[in-house]
Amino acid sequence: MPTPLSLQTLAKKLLATQYISKDYYFILKYCGLWWHGAPIMLSTNEDNQLMIKSASFKEGLSLDLALMKVVQENNHDLIKLFTEWGADINSSLVTVNMECTRNLCRELGAKEALNERDILQIFYKTRDIKTSSHVILCHELLSNNPLFQNIERMRSIIYRSLEKLSINFILDDISFSEMLTRHWYGLAILYNLTEAIQYFYEKYKHFKNWRLICGLSFNNLSDLYEIYNLEKVDMDIDEMMYLACSMYGGNYSTIYYCFVLGADINQAMLTSVINHHIDNLFFCIDLGADAFEESMELAKQKNHNILVHILSFKNYSPDFSLLSLKMTDPEKINALLDEEKYESKNMLMYDEFDACTNNL
């Protein structure tokens, strides 16, 4: 059972959740609710997790990450405060850099050292928060952190997450620090965190086409559109379509965009079969793909029996209402092809066929 908060700590917590006029900032300073020249604010995110906000971290940090930052800064008052508010004191060991701060963390209950499991748990927890402030600070505190360099399981997790995306570099040839940097950059694009995307883009321009690759793979058409029109892209349009089809199912927006730009929709159909992305397969058929014989052969080779059954249906046809649009505006495309709302005409036809077959 957690230790009850002291009245003083509870009062500070309550104060940090209120809107305070600038006329009363002196009260916040006096109470220690001040960080980087501005008030500390508390809020909860969509998952009901407590978030710390301040001038430098406007979109919010998790309590644990905020603790790691104040430990790095050797800010003893805020170390005590964030720990009292519920931050895991063991996460302080990720960034501790002075013996006096280490001693304070011990007094507050920190272990002598973190084991591999502790480090992995800290890493997993950091990935749950979807704000620019959080992702940027995760990169700054963790990507070059010695504690994270020699954990084999973590290396394996990051390696697998980047494996399909490493189309223009050899994964085995880059450092683990670079892998982690690409991981955080990719998360920024996956969650469409505009400020974080801009931060990574400006700082890591030498990560050739990484923003484009992630935009295609994670179905972030808004960012894909921006980067495609911002700079000269030296990636073949069919290679772009391959990324849109191969990473995840339901990548309708980026598949459609590549199709409108001239990508081979039959090749996209084959890629969807190879990667067993049924949603993408039906969408390619909606867009006029008709490589049924080659797709059937691939499905049989890979023993994808569900795909073999899907491809055995003979009455598929293009969705001409979709083909007639030929639009490139990302907002309109996203509205039309929202993964939760879009219904493939050909998938509905197959579902009817499948239901009739099962009732025979």
From Swiss-Prot:
**GO terms under biological process:** taxis
What SUPFAM superfamilies does its record include? Ankyrin repeat (SSF48403)
Similarity comment: family membership: Belongs to the asfivirus MGF 360 family.
Q: What is the protein's known function?
A: Plays a role in virus cell tropism, and may be required for efficient virus replication in macrophages.
UniProt-recorded name of the protein: Protein MGF 360-2L
Name the species this protein comes from: African swine fever virus (isolate Warthog/Namibia/Wart80/1980) (ASFV)
